[in-house]
């Protein structure tokens, strides 16, 4: 069983979080008074206490919240937990939604140390059940259920739709097919993200890597970008 070692918040984005020792987590929103709370999949950020201590041993002058993490948890290698894992602490229930993130190379820790552990060690979660959380509270890991729905991301590629010159009809059509399949074939899908991109290769590559590595979705569906125009590069990006 793990333990909460710090509860960190910041009221403004771009500022270091401070350990407030206890806070209220709000369902489907995040930590009360924290700048990163909101209706998105990265409501709460977490780091392993042991990984922070290893980094400190290299001479890093850091305090709780220096990496922008909300919760510091001991007893678990958090990055090894798959997306979909749930973390229970008292009445609070979180679900892991992302592993790692892109680093802002200009952060203060990176400037000093030439390294930052948040991109490879940090994880993110949504609040399924809210409540109070405090330093010293126990944390229990609940592994993902085998019969949970397949997680899906839908990506539409269209220069005109991205520019607002045309409605995206393909993405919603794919969502409808998935919902109809649930009723017909009894296969459950959970659409995690719907993304509209301009045509081209690099933007799609970045999203495919993020969705596969960080979000760990089971299925990525793309539509558009398969014609003969120079910017129709969906097959090339996927390969």
Predicted regions: what they are:
Residues 122-145:
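Well-ordered alpha/beta subsegment
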Residues 16-19, 104-109, 164:
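Short, solvent-exposed secondary-structure boundary/capping segments
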């Amino acid at each position: 069983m793990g333990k909460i070692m710090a509860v960190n918040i910041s009221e403004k984005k771009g500022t270091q979080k401070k350990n407030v020792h206890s806070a209220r987590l709000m369902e489907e929103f995040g930590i009360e008074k924290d700048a990163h709370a909101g209706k998105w999949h990265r409501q709460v950020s977490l780091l392993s206490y042991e990984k922070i201590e290893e980094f400190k041993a290299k001479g890093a002058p850091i305090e709780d919240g220096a990496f922008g993490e909300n919760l510091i948890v001991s007893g678990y290698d958090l990055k090894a937990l798959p997306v979909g894992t749930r973390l229970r602490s008292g009445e609070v229930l979180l679900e892991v939604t992302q592993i790692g993130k892109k680093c802002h190379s200009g952060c203060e820790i990176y400037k000093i140390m030439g390294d930052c552990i948040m991109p490879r060690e940090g994880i993110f979660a949504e609040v399924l059940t809210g409540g109070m959380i405090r330093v010293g509270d126990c944390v229990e890991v609940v592994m993902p259920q085998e019969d949970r729905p397949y997680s899906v991301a839908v990506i539409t590629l269209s220069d005109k739709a991205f520019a607002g010159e045309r409605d995206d009809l393909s993405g919603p059509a794919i969502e409808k097919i998935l919902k109809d399949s649930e009723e017909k074939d009894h296969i459950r899908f959970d659409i995690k993200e719907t993304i509209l991109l301009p045509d081209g290769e690099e933007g799609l590559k970045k999203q495919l890597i993020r969705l596969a590595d960080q979000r760990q979705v089971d299925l990525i569906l793309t539509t558009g970008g398969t014609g003969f125009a120079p910017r129709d590069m969906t097959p090339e990006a996927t390969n």
